[in-house]
Amino acid sequence: YGTGLQFFAHRHPQRFFDVGMAEQHAVTFAAGLASQGMLPVVCIYSTFLQRSYDQILHDVNLLQENVVFAIDRAGFVPADGETHQGVYDPAFLSQIGMPLYAPSNYAELTYWLHELLKDGCRGPRAIRYPRGGENARLAQYGCSGQDYDFLHRTEGAQAVLISYADEM
């Protein structure tokens, strides 16, 4: 349970399926569940999601199945080694037009996850989050629910720094 779902699995054993190291199967399985009216949430490390690109494209995206991808270990993950860096999912998911959310703190993560699970939300969509807790400095800013936030704004500044999610 590298994605931290052991508590959910224990609490909801009939709603949790561990397919092991079979990302392609996980995505196709989720597409099948979605085709029958369920709302599956597929939790996969970012670096391993690329293994299932064909299934994401053909089984989920082209059919516009109602699947939520929870992309764990997104961004730079130094402690996991060079093979586990989660840096490619924004490129290959945006290529097929899948909405991708990258909250910068826990409040935004909670907000967007609830939004993605609402009944009115349809089609494939994804939310990515880093390994571990949130950046303590960003935690003080709260969640506006907007598409962007100004974390620090100075009149007359000579430079602009743009950040994606919690990475700077």
Q: What are these model-predicted stretches?
A:
Residues 45, 130, 163-166:
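Structural motif
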Residues 127:
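All-alpha helical catalytic cores of prenyl diphosphate-utilizing isoprenoid enzymes
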Residues 1-124, 133-135, 145:
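Thiamine diphosphate
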Residues 138-140:
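Flexible inter-domain linker/hinge segments
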Residues 121, 143-168:
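Long hydrophobic segments that form regular secondary structure
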